[in-house]
């Protein structure tokens, strides 16, 4: 299993193999997840002071805030995966 890295904006990169979900921060349950992660010291703010547009939930229960749209992060995830599969052929 090879490591897949995803750019989440402003030079920040996460391991794609450990991502559980990429969601919008608008709903009350997601806001609760963010506040719970902050209390547990498991919140990583990668927004550089900008508005949070995507919340990335990792398999280690860490929550990462990103200033990039969830669709954009997901597309980077899929495009990178497709690129690597085509490179193997």
From Swiss-Prot:
Top-level taxon: Bacteria
Family: Belongs to the RemA family.
Name used for this protein in its record: Putative regulatory protein ssl2874
């Amino acid at each position: 299993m090879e490591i897949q890295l995803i750019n989440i904006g402003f030079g920040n990169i996460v391991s794609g193999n450990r991502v559980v979900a990429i969601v919008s921060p608008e709903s009350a349950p997601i806001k609760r997840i963010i506040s719970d992660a902050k209390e547990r010291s498991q919140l990583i703010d990668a927004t550089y002071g900008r508005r949070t547009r995507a919340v990335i939930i990792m398999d280690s229960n860490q929550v990462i805030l990103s200033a990039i749209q969830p669709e954009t992060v997901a597309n980077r995830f899929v495009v990178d995966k497709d690129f690597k599969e085509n490179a193997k052929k």
